[in-house]
């Protein structure tokens, strides 16, 4: 209830939920009926295989970290239709102020928000610093077997800055810049980009 009151005080009009149907069923959103809920659930490619390896006890901490770096690269490049959807929903009526979230709040949400912040002109170092805060705001997510290596689980559930840096490096390597990525891959026009900046930047 305190969280709902906080959302009301912030004037939140929309919630963007990147969780799949089973994830939403386990922990439904509890928001004011007047708040619009927009659902675009997806699982990052490679996640099921990674979680299976962890739960089998076959993924070492070092392998888990390497897998996460690769996952973040793929997360940036393989799910562009979802990022384009977020941008355009934000520009729609009552699209903002908004909250965007997933299950743990650092992977799908982290990359989505980072790309959005870079699109509206926030400096890369500030974006990485913002992401790092997620590491200290995490809540336990019960999705691992009891015999999974705890150190490997910690690597997967951590919000290490180099994870997000890997995603941004992949975008820059593939497209030259985030601006080119947004234009060529997400199809955002300069007018839409300016509108997003006006909407989100004070």
Locate each region found by the language model.
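Ser/Thr-glycine-rich phosphate-binding loops at phosphate-binding pockets of nucleotides
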Residues: 104, 108-109
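Cys-dependent protein tyrosine phosphatase-like superfamily
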Residues: 1-99, 111-202
């Amino acid at each position: 209830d305190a969280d709902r009151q906080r959302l009301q005080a912030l004037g939140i009009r929309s919630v963007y939920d990147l969780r799949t149907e089973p994830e939403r069923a386990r922990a439904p959103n509890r928001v004011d009926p007047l708040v619009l809920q927009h659902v675009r659930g997806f699982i990052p490619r490679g996640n099921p295989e990674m979680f299976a390896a962890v739960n089998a006890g076959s993924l070492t901490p070092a392998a888990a970290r390497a897998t996460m770096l690769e996952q973040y690269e793929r997360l940036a490049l393989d799910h562009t239709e979802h990022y384009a959807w977020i941008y355009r929903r934000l520009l729609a009526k009552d699209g903002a102020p908004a909250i965007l979230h997933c299950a743990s709040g650092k992977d799908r949400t982290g990359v989505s928000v980072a790309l959005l912040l870079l699109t509206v002109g926030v400096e890369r170092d500030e974006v990485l610093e913002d992401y790092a805060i997620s590491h200290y705001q995490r809540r336990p997510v019960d999705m691992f077997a009891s015999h999974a290596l705890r150190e490997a689980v910690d690597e997967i559930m951590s919000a290490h800055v180099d994870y997000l840096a890997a995603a941004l490096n992949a975008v820059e390597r593939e497209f030259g810049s985030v601006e080119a990525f947004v234009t060529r891959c997400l199809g955002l026009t300069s007018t839409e980009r300016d509108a997003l900046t006006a909407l989100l930047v004070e």
